[in-house]
UniProtKB/Swiss-Prot annotation:
The gene is argS. Its main location: cytoplasm. Its EC number is 6.1.1.19. This is Arginine--tRNA ligase. One of its GO terms (molecular function) is arginine-tRNA ligase activity. It catalyses: tRNA(Arg) + L-arginine + ATP = L-arginyl-tRNA(Arg) + AMP + diphosphate. It comes from Bordetella avium (strain 197N). CDD domains: Anticodon_Ia_Arg (cd07956), ArgRS_core (cd00671). Monomer.
């Protein structure tokens, strides 16, 4: 049911309860029964109140039902009610209540499922790869999840900023530079003098070739970097290689249809003095101590659940990796982002408590749950029943660009979103390429394209279809489809609240299934002109909501296939 219908029904149930138990203050929840034959919605309010009221739950449920059905306002929504099991109340809607979604979608169009704007902003950080190689399938999952979460928050009225954090300071950048230098000197990955921690992908040879050619490269947010071609200048090689790979990652993101609002460089935390100031503040606040020549943070005393204190500055003088993370998240807070979400691999699980502890130690009034985290598990790529592990381009892993070239951007986005982030996922290339009902992307996009074709072949214009009488829509499969469409705004709300875009993917698959079921059960282009127009209006309504849902995942609503 529509959100406004849901709130109205909850208020009607509360009024019915108040007539029986004036002192009660129930938390009334409505759910869709797992079995459609049991009704349109169900509530356990009678079971919730029975014990404190010292009443039999079924008798109390009957009293609530009697009071509800005696209310004229309720009869406009509720057609019938029954008591099930220990005291569940199952409700069935009137035809008019079920048909209301058609008018709602006609009025709201692309805004159906979207909330009013709110004066709140959120920063979502995701992908955040080291500039040491092409983006891999794990980054692709982050890109799909992160962009969908951004779209969900935008639909929920938030001001959303997408941010990419470049880990451009550390040993991995040095390893990149010496790898390119070795290639420039004609040393291959199989040679005994190849660096022990060197990167071996073909892209290293490409960087070396362009460096020797004194090429110029520029990342999306940076200044052009001109190669000198001097193979002895490791710093020049490093700067060129980082810029080269940042540009390559920009191209990967462009192919994915993803544009970031801001790029933040880890190196800037050091050059600006943020890391030093963060450490000095933690020392001044009394949350550190020295032991064995190292500086430790008392994370176990800062209330974020860390199980042991953590080294901040090693005995040889370098900072551990979580220290710049604390400085970075303080920078987020100071930029006015009091809501922040990080999309990262599950291997970052151990950093959550220590980063939050560091932020608590700064005593800036930052909430303990800042930032929020979505930690995803990795992806296994399968083709022909075998795991695909190697990419010629990357040398040791399948890249984001590989996936896009193999199956297309839409399939990559949907497949990487359709499971909970915290579950392992097998990306089946053969399934993603198949034109069958088993392929969810094909199944959903085909539903949208079929509706476009149906409406075009009807010869009716949009105005005629929009004016059709939805009261003619009374077939069981039509009621089922309309109920599914009415759920969409609440699914969007749930997906945003739980940072879980897979709810949208599930809903799209279910909606496509309901549409195909209706299409197969009821002829649309019938001789009865009024019924034909009403069914075309339902089809157009379905097309609009499917398009709205696909847009939240960044997937194309195809008009023909």
């Amino acid at each position: 049911m529509l959100p406004e219908q849901q709130q109205h029904l909850i208020s009607l149930l509360a009024r019915a309860v108040a007539g029986i138990l004036p002192e009660a203050s129930p938390d009334i929840l409505l759910e869709r029964p797992k079995v459609a034959a049991h009704g349109d919605v169900a509530t356990n309010v009678a079971m919730q109140l029975a014990k404190p009221a010292k009443r039999n739950p079924r008798e109390l449920a009957q009293g609530i039902v009697d009071a509800l059905l005696a209310d004229p306002q309720a009869r406009a929504i509720v057609d019938s009610a029954e008591i099930a099991g220990p005291g569940f109340i199952n409700l069935r809607f009137t035809a008019q209540a079920r048909q209301a979604v058609v008018a709602a979608v006609s009025a709201q169009g692309a805004a159906f499922g979207r909330a009013a704007r709110r004066d709140e902003k959120v920063l979502v950080e995701f992908v955040s790869a080291n500039p040491t190689g092409p983006l891999h399938v794990g980054h692709a999952r982050q890109a799909a999840l992160g962009d969908a979460i951004c779209r969900l928050f935008d639909a929920s009225g938030w001001d959303v900023t997408r941010e990419f954090y470049y880990n451009d300071a550390g040993n991995q950048i040095q390893n990149l530079a010496i790898s390119v230098q070795a290639r420039a000197r004609g040393i291959g990955p199989d040679a005994p003098e190849w660096p022990a921690d060197g990167y071996k992908g073909d892209y290293i040879a490409d960087i070396a070739r362009d460096y020797l050619a004194q090429a110029s490269v520029q990342a999306a947010d940076g200044e052009p970097v001109q190669a000198s071609g001097n193979i002895d200048d490791l710093e020049d090689i490093r700067a060129f290689a980082v810029a080269y790979l940042r540009r390559e990652q920009d191209l990967d993101l462009q192919a994915f249809g993803l544009k970031f609002d801001n790029f933040f460089l880890e190196s800037s935390l050091y050059t600006s003095g943020r890391v030093e100031r963060t450490v000095e503040t933690l020392i001044a606040k009394g949350h550190t101590y020295e032991q064995d020549g190292a500086l430790w943070l008392r994370t176990t005393e800062l209330g974020t659940g860390d199980d042991k204190d953590r080294v901040m500055r090693k005995s040889e003088g370098g900072y551990t990796y979580f220290v710049p993370d604390v400085a970075y998240h303080l920078a987020k807070w100071e930029r006015g982002f009091h809501h922040a979400i990080n999309i990262q691999g599950s291997d970052h699980h151990g950093t959550v408590a220590r980063v939050r502890a560091g932020l608590q130690g700064l005593e800036e009034g930052i909430p303990k749950e800042f930032p929020a985290y979505v930690l995803h598990k990795m992806v296994k790529v399968m083709r022909g029943g075998e795991e695909v592990k190697i990419s010629k381009r990357a040398g040791s892993y399948v890249t984001m660009r590989d996936l896009i070239e193999w199956v297309g951007r839409d399939a990559v986005r949907y497949f990487l979103i359709q499971r909970r982030a915290d579950t392992e996922f097998v990306f089946d290339i053969d399934l993603a390429l198949s034109k069958s009902d088993e392929n969810p992307v094909y199944y959903i996009q085909y539903a949208h394209a079929r509706i476009c074709s149906m409406i075009a072949s009807s010869g009716l214009d949009d105005a005629t279809i929009a004016a059709a009488d939805a009261a003619r829509l009374t077939a069981p499969s039509e009621f089922a489809l309309m109920q599914r469409l009415a759920e969409f705004p609440n699914v969007v709300k749930l997906a945003a609240q739980e940072l879980a875009p897979h709810h949208i993917a599930f809903w799209l698959r279910d909606c496509a299934s309901d549409f195909h079921g209706w299409y197969n059960a009821e002829r649309v282009l019938v001789d009865d002109e009024g019924l034909k127009q009403a069914r075309l209006r339902l089809a157009a309504t379905t097309r609009q909501v499917l398009a709205n849902g696909l847009a939240l995942l960044g997937v194309t609503a195809l008009e023909r296939m």
